[in-house]
Swiss-Prot record:
Residues 106-386 are annotated as: RecA-like domain 1. The lineage of its organism: Eukaryota, Metazoa, Chordata, Craniata, Vertebrata. Changing residue 65 to A: Does not inhibit G4-DNA-binding. Its cofactor is Mg(2+). Multifunctional ATP-dependent helicase that unwinds G-quadruplex (G4) structures. Plays a role in many biological processes such as genomic integrity, gene expression regulations and as a sensor to initiate antiviral responses. G4 structures correspond to helical structures containing guanine tetrads. Binds with high affinity to and unwinds G4 structures that are formed in nucleic acids (G4-DNA and G4-RNA). Plays a role in genomic integrity. This is ATP-dependent DNA/RNA helicase DHX36. It comes from Homo sapiens (Human).
Length: 1008
């Protein structure tokens, strides 16, 4: 219930609701609640006494009667469980005085204020009604002036003089320089006498691409866009850029050449740049010809006559500062067949850019299978193919493997052949359904064909096996066969995820054979400690066989030279976004033909190899050519903001021009979410908040959390949380030590009931250990199962975020630990409130279920009903919560719907940083609700005070976003300081103050 007041605030003179004024009644009164749901035990008529159903009901009606009665019980239980929002008399009087003091100022301003949290009621397009109002022309003039002022503010925000550190290299001029041209030519000629260069030249000459150098250079010179396709190992990534640069230098035009080559992964950008530098007998970066730039890390080449390898995101960042990429002569988009979201967007941007940069050369490099599609997208531009350089690889399908090793599964019962088939997980795609129908239709004919070519026992096993599961026992049997019957060589096993990798590792280690020092078994996954994974690149001593168990990271991101045998499990973990239910899903999908080809190629790098595909021939014939492009299976909010900050036009229009446009439903859902976040106005233009969020290199909700961390002066811990959510948390899980790792994580959690604060505690403990020296840092990471590399990355990201905030004016120092930005960093509840401000409306309700044996907690969301906290969370076994609400970062459906990264939050967190507030009465219970479903008990006068204080917060936050500057906490008489202090005080003192539980401290040789 809203209230338009014209009187002073006070305990007896406050706004009155339909239920009366503020005069009497205790702040948390419950009188009469229990009576409302009692009585009526036999009120159903007939023989319904003692809670039994009426006698005239039959069959389904009886069930419905009991269901209705249970629903009433649940509703009443929920009423009784509601937390009470209260404040003591002293704070109530202080807030009344505060609201009175700002009343006069607010009366002079328009009442059409913008709420960050309830854009349905207020927005940038809100109009003040002028009908039947005296002096309406004057009001219209005022509104026009406000709109003009708004445009001026937007101009200032957009054009604030701040250049991201990652963009500095691009903005260096690239003018032709005759003196430099001559020097570059002389340096290249000298290199040809350098023994290191000569040695590398011998290697380069063996690559298939080297023999096509003239043809490639001529094609690029004579066309604005060229598509180059080639197999793995042909040399296209390392050689084409060098061909272009050397051609320019030899023609005396070296200073005019500045090549930028994009890579889909950080590791690729670094490794390729270092390889090219080595081939040119140079060190990487240091002002030489070749360098790299990835987020927060770079070794930059010289300004002109150079090659820069960078991640795709770096170029998208550059476009904010220079939309024409005016200093770049050649842009090479590599690995475009992977179809990640950023590369798809960049292709469309570059396609538009060609209309303004006739001098820009664009080279698209892809695997062979779909080069034609890219050529068509760029107006049928010319294509050229470079043959691969791999040894022959013998391929086997599932039926071949079973016949070869005579495998018999443990389970003898006949399987349900078509239980799920192509419809893995919950991915509801029409193509998958169609392929499932085809598979089912063709299966009988395929079995008859198998019986003509394979033994009866093999066909029986094929029919017996579960088609939708990876048979790990089969993989163990196949590895044993290779070890005992085949020649030496490393074995690479592809599995979809951590659970499969862990289980296979355990199965192997349970056998005496694999426990010996004749085997080196290496799991390869992002959750594994990096130090263990470095062994994967080292060749083993004679007599030792290496077995690598990996996800699809080993398809393209890394090369293991000594692999001879590849076991393709046939599955890949893929994330999709269900627009109808607004939920991400992750499931094990069948690999595509492109995946299978990449996996096969891993076996033939240094000698002839073998590839075992663990799916049958019918399945192989129906595999998709490629994985679904990322743009079609991911939320689009961050991309929508990028489109607007780059001024690429209307969101839906731009996205419709991509090679594979996302669905209208996905686009509209993302736009709606951004409007709810108040990042876009009703005309789909960026709001001041939207501009700031678009410039932060994170997802919008995390960006909002960062801004609130600055405004509420708890910057350092909030930046740690933001970095972790946008990159990954620093925890690792060594195989066999999962339970110990979980215990250590809960130890770091202390009593916070927060995954987010657990990461903060881990990070702060690492910082303290690092200050003491390398040995202490190493011991700390070892004891708490932390990755020092990830922690260092989080540290670097925090510095980048602070740079953004300084450039935008939100803080006065680029140091995340600046005391002025961390006044409230030692209070857990303020940090939780800021987490809530960023992640809302990702809220779940906790309900305690008192079972006969032990307490249990059930968790519900508004849209999904019953969900589960992810097993990795510190809250997974928690039953003693202070409050009934969790805020979470990610909701994903796998085997169940899981909440990832969750934190317990208090009522005041949700009231001040949640959605729209309403004041209601539920029977005899006075309530205050957030978005109508998060309901608390509250006396009416307290509810009105909270609602009015929230309005003041919304006004203040909007002013801070439009004109960013740090809060002056010393100016206690200012409105900003008074409003924020009052809210902080309420959050800090609800129930009882909760001091931060700090990370383990090093004492007497131990962390405690």
């Amino acid at each position: 219930m809203s209230y338009d007041y014209h009187q002073n605030w006070g305990r007896d003179g406050g706004p009155r609701s339909s239920g009366g004024g503020y005069g009497g009644g205790p702040a948390g009164g419950h009188g009469g609640n229990r009576g409302s749901g009692g009585g009526g035990g036999g009120g159903g008529g007939g023989r319904g006494g003692r809670g039994r159903h009426p006698g005239h009901l039959k069959g389904r009606e009886i069930g419905m009667w009991y269901a209705k009665k249970q629903g009433q019980k649940n509703k009443e239980a929920e009423r009784q469980e509601r937390a009470v929002v209260h404040m003591d008399e002293r704070r109530e009087e202080q807030i009344v005085q505060l609201l009175n003091s700002v009343q006069a100022k607010n009366d002079k301003e328009s009442e059409a204020q913008i709420s960050w949290f309830a854009p349905e009621d207020h927005g940038y397009g809100t109009e003040v009604s002028t009908k039947n109002t005296p002096c309406s022309e004057n009001k219209l003039d005022i509104q026009e002036k406000k709109l003009i002022n708004q445009e001026k503010k937007m101009f200032r925000i957009r054009n604030r003089s701040y250049i991201d550190r990652d963009s500095e290299y691009l903005l260096q001029e690239n003018e032709p320089d005759g003196t430099l041209d001559q020097k570059l030519l002389e340096d290249l000629q000298k290199k040809k006498n350098d023994l290191r260069y000569i040695e590398m030249q011998h290697f380069r000459e063996k690559l298939p691409s080297y023999g096509m150098q003239k043809e490639l250079v001529n094609l690029i010179d004579n066309h604005q866009v060229t598509v180059i396709s080639g197999e793995t190992g042909c040399g296209k990534t390392t050689q084409v850029t060098q061909f272009i640069l050397d051609n320019y230098i030899e023609r005396g035009k070296g200073s005019a050449c500045r090549i930028v080559c994009t890579q889909p992964r950080r590791i690729s950008a670094i490794s390729v740049a270092e390889r090219v530098a080595a081939e040119r007998a140079e060190s990487c970066g240091s002002g030489n010809s070749t360098g790299y730039q990835i987020r927060l890390q770079s070794r930059l080449p010289r300004k002109q006559g150079s090659i820069l390898y960078c991640t795709t995101g770096i170029i998208l960042q550059w476009l904010q500062s220079d939309p024409y990429l005016s200093s770049v002569s050649h842009i090479v988009l590599d690995e475009i067949h992977e179809r990640n979201l950023q590369s798809d967007v960049l292709m469309t941007v570059v396609k538009d850019l060609l209309n303004f940069r006739s001098d820009l050369k664009v080279i698209l490099m892809s695997a062979t299978l779909n080069a034609e599609k890219f050529s068509e997208y760029f107006g049928n531009c010319p294509m050229i193919h470079i043959p691969g350089f791999t040894f022959p690889v013998v391929e086997y399908l599932l039926e071949d493997v079973i016949e070869k090793i005579r495998y018999v599964p443990e389970q003898k019962e006949h399987r349900s052949q078509f239980k799920r088939g192509f419809m893995q997980g919950h991915v509801n795609r029409q193509e998958k359904e169609e392929k499932e129908a085809i598979y089912k239709e063709r299966w009988p004919d395929y079995v008859r064909e198998l019986r003509r070519r394979y033994s009866a026992s093999t066909v029986d096993v094929i029919e017996m096996m579960e088609d939708d599961k990876v048979d790990l026992n089969l993989i163990v049997a196949l590895i044993r066969y290779i070890v005992l019957e085949e020649e030496d060589g490393a074995i690479l096993v592809f599995l979809p995820g951590w659970d499969n990798i862990s289980t296979l590792h355990d199965l192997l280690m349970s056998q005496v054979m694999f426990k010996s020092d004749k085997f080196l078994i290496i799991p390869l996954h992002s959750l594994m400690p990096t130090v263990n994974q470095t062994q994967v690149f080292k060749r083993t001593p004679p007599g030792v066989r290496k077995i690598v168990i990996a996800t699809n990271i080993a398809e393209t991101s890394i090369t293991i030279d000594d692999v001879v045998y590849v076991i393709d499990g046939g599955k890949i973990k893929e994330t999709h976004f269900d627009t109808q239910n607004n939920i991400s899903t992750m499931s094990a999908e069948w690999v595509s033909k492109a995946n299978a080809k990449q996996r096969k190629g891993r076996a033939g790098r240094v000698q002839p190899g073998h590839c075992y595909h663990l799916y049958n021939g019918l399945r192989a014939s129906l595999l998709d050519d490629y994985q679904l492009p990322e743009i079609l299976r991911t939320p689009l909010e961050e991309l929508c903001l990028q489109i607007k900050i780059l001024r690429l036009g209307g969101i839906a229009y731009f996205l419709s021009r991509l090679m594979d446009p996302p669905s209208n439903e996905a686009v509209l859902l993302s736009i709606r979410h951004l409007m709810e976040l108040n990042a876009l106005d009703k005309q789909e233009e960026l709001t001041p908040l939207g501009v700031h969020l678009a410039r932060l290199p994170v997802e919008p909700h995390i960006g909002k959390m960062i801004l609130f961390g600055a405004l509420f002066c708890c910057l350092d811990p909030v930046l740690t949380i933001a970095a972790s959510l946008s990159f990954k948390d620093p925890f690792v899980i060594p195989l066999g030590k999962e339970k110990i790792a979980d215990a250590r994580r809960k130890e770091l959690a202390k009593d916070t009931r927060s995954d987010h604060l657990t990461v903060v505690n881990a990070f702060e403990g690492w910082e303290e250990a690092r200050r003491r020296g390398f040995r202490y840092e190493k011991d700390y990471c070892w004891e708490y199962f932390l990755s020092s590399n990830t922690l260092q990355m989080l540290h670097n990201m925090k510095g980048q975020f602070a740079e953004h905030l300084l450039g935008a004016g939100f803080v006065s120092s680029r140091n995340p630990k600046d005391p002025e930005s961390n006044i409230n960093s030692d209070n857990e509840k303020i940090i939780k409130a800021v987490i809530c401000a960023g992640l809302y409306p990702k809220v779940a309700k906790i309900r305690l279920n008192l079972g006969k044996k032990r307490k249990m907690v059930k968790v519900y969301t508004k849209t999904d009903g019953l969900v589960a906290v992810h097993p990795k969370s510190v809250n997974v076994e928690q039953t003693d919560f202070h409050y009934n609400w969790l805020i979470y970062h990610l909701k994903m459906r796998t085997s169940s719907i899981y909440l990832y990264d969750c934190t317990e939050v208090s009522p005041y967190c949700l009231l001040f940083f949640g959605g729209d507030i309403s004041i209601q009465k539920d029977n005899d219970q006075e309530t205050i609700a957030v978005d109508e479903w998060i309901v608390f008990q509250s006396p009416a006068r307290i509810a009105h005070l909270v609602k009015e204080l929230r309005k003041e917060l919304d006004i203040l936050l909007q002013e801070k976003i439009e004109s960013p500057h740090p809060v002056d906490w010393n100016d206690t008489k200012s409105r900003d300081c008074a409003v924020l202090s009052a809210i902080i005080d309420l959050i800090k003192t609800q129930e009882k103050a909760t001091p931060r539980n700090f990370p383990p401290r090093f004492q007497d040789g131990y962390y405690s």
